[in-house]
């Protein structure tokens, strides 16, 4: 509100950033564990010792209910209501774009990735959205 009061116009931008969720709110029993490489290869030839690969990810899928909710609320999505204009990324479309572009798919794959080794924050890869 203070930015508006200062005369700065506010709007949504297409950042393509998926939501973050708290790991304490996630049922990992419903997901498939995706461990890292047993012998991870470092990015640099200058790495003296192999990195410790302690972080794990999980694979999960959206449900038909998720797709229904998105379809029923597309008019609220700034990318589909005209609030945000422009073309989104080709290879990482928003979730609502996947729902529109692939109407025959009953589910979409998501990867749940830790944001770091010492945080409860998780990144939901494949779930970027402009939905409110």
Set out the residue ranges of the language-model regions:
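An anion/pyrophosphate-binding glycine-rich loop and adjacent beta-alpha core
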Residues: 2-131
């Amino acid at each position: 509100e203070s930015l508006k009061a200062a005369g700065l116009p506010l709007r949504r931008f297409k950042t393509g950033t998926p939501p973050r969720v708290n790991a304490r709110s996630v049922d990992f029993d419903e997901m498939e564990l995706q461990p890292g490489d047993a012998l991870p290869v470092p990015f640099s030839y200058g790495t003296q010792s192999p990195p410790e690969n302690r972080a794990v990810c999980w694979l999960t899928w959206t449900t038909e209910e998720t797709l229904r909710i998105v379809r029923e609320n597309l008019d609220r999505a700034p990318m589909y209501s005209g609030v945000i204009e422009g073309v989104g990324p080709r290879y990482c479309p928003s979730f609502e774009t996947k729902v529109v572009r692939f109407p025959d798919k009953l589910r979409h794959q998501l990867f749940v990735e830790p944001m770091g080794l010492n945080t409860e924050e998780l990144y939901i890869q494949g779930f970027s959205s402009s939905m409110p």
